[in-house]
């Protein structure tokens, strides 16, 4: 890979290896080597600019969860070393809640949750990122109410006027990566499926999904088959019936020894104006940054992962 350290055999190896080196190897200072000093990191809760803030956040997380592991389940990617590459990295993380921190007093509980990180890299450095951590899964396992947790966090940060602002179109910062993925058929198929679902065509689920599809969804939800997919997507869409659904990025891949896969990053922007997963409509403005991965087999979409915060 031109411009990258020769110790990495390919781009997925680069992404998985530096993640392990930084977090499990405790080489947090290597972020200076692998992350651009002006990196932009967008997550549902904030937009962060600068590598020093990334380093500070990494130290804070490891202080609360010293035994954190990050298992790279998949890296779905596009691009080339000369122009830059974009990876969608799905991680299964395990931790033990042994130290006091953002989640309160230590409980000793062992937690499992997923992250999807879309990273743009060129010349051995990551310079643009979209990061989604399944906070709902963490809170559920700690018996914390997500709504109360969010309210308390806002209060600690000085109230609605002074707290860290969540990511929206208003505080978007244009970074080095302006691509929208690749034109692989599998990425296009998955984008079409999600677009049809968000256009209220839920009949696409039994048409395109394998009856035995395995489902891993935001909030630590594990489910199976058509009903599980229908419950999740119906509950989300019915909560925000008038919200605009936008595909921001799509990648499809067909690699040796791997099934066809796709990664899609999307935004749902509008009002909480319907009954669904989030209860009684409040009319609140809502901006959801989501990431979805899928795997296809002989009978259709057979594995689906979808995260938002």
Question: Regions from the language model: what does each represent?
Answer:
Residues 1-309:
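C-terminal and inter-domain tail/linker signature
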